[in-house]
From Swiss-Prot:
Gene: rpl23
GO MF annotation list: rRNA binding; structural constituent of ribosome
Functional summary from the UniProt entry: Binds to 23S rRNA. One of the proteins that surrounds the polypeptide exit tunnel on the outside of the ribosome.
Subunit structure: Part of the 50S ribosomal subunit. Contacts protein L29.
Record key words, sorted: Ribonucleoprotein, Ribosomal protein, RNA-binding, rRNA-binding
PROSITE patterns reported for this sequence: RIBOSOMAL_L23
Cited InterPro entries: Nucleotide-bd_a/b_plait_sf, Ribosomal_uL23, Ribosomal_uL23-like, Ribosomal_uL23/eL15/eS24_sf, Ribosomal_uL23_CS
Protein name (database record): Large ribosomal subunit protein uL23
Amino acid sequence: MGDVILSPVSTEKTALLAEKENKLTLIVDRKATKEDIKREVESRFSVKVEGINILITKKGKKAIVKLAKEYSAEEIAERIGVF
């Protein structure tokens, strides 16, 4: 999916986050900063990012991206093939 965003995460939990809290969950490059992720998400999906939480797991770095209220995380997730 690019240099910063490696892939979307598709689980029941991420679907609930998209629906209830307007958040996207993405696997990102381990060296990517929050600012890098914000820039990439805003330019690629034409949305406004309100906040980013980062988790580092055995599988890599995971970013949970909260979108502004006027954008739908569910719509973006459908567009990129999460569900």
